[in-house]
Regions:
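A charged, well-structured terminal subsegment
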Residues: 2-27
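Non-transmembrane, aqueous-exposed alpha-helical and coiled segments at domain scale
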Residues: 32-189
Length: 189
């Protein structure tokens, strides 16, 4: 009797597991304008800043560099792109990632203005459909984004590429990795 019930239910379970998509998947989130980003003033200690940003789902709860207007403006000097340009609708929530938000999350992750072209290139790479960002960020399997960067930019930006490049003493590697995690977790949802 149990087997018959399971066999009867299996086609619907299989269909839901392999073809289901959220009803809003692929649609742009329009309830909040992407640019200019909302400005807020937070007073208190650095620990208060980290706690408040985490409570409001603006960070992952780990330490960040405060994205002050001055720091974001300095970061934007690393690109000629318009700050209002939407560079990616980040799955699965399809949050709008603008150039200004790339700069903001770059600051928070510890990146420098000279890293902006790399951050924008990373975004461009991860939004490629062949990467399947949505699949890798919504699976229950253990996944982690991986970037392969090559060429003169490695030495120019101080990107580690020898022994220990995945270790903690490679600040550019760590900052760029933290940046993409913040974008995925906060903008993508």
């Amino acid at each position: 009797e149990v087997r018959a019930k399971a066999e009867k239910a299996f086609p619907a379970i299989y269909e839901a597991a392999t073809h289901w998509k959220p009803k809003d998947a692929g649609k742009e989130v329009k309830d909040v304008p992407a640019y200019p980003a909302k400005r807020v003033k937070i007073t208190g200690t650095y620990a208060d800043l980290i706690r408040i940003m985490y409570q409001r789902k603006w960070s992952a709860g780990l330490p960040v560099i405060p994205p002050t207007p001055e720091a974001v403006a300095a970061m934007l000097k690393g690109t000629k792109k318009d700050p209002s340009e939407i560079v990616w609708l980040v799955p699965p929530r399809m949050g709008q990632l603008t150039v200004e938000l790339v700069a903001t999350y770059g600051v928070m992750a510890g990146c420098k203005p000279e890293h902006m072209p790399l951050l924008l290139a990373v975004v461009e790479a991860f939004k490629n459909p062949s990467v399947d960002w949505q699949g890798s960020t919504t699976t229950t399997a253990a996944t982690v984004p991986v970037m392969v960067i090559s060429g003169p930019i490695l030495d120019k930006l101080g990107i580690g590429y020898s022994s220990g490049e995945l270790g903690s003493f490679m600040p550019v590697n760590t900052s760029v990795g933290y940046f993409i995690n913040l974008v995925g977790d906060i903008i993508g949802g």
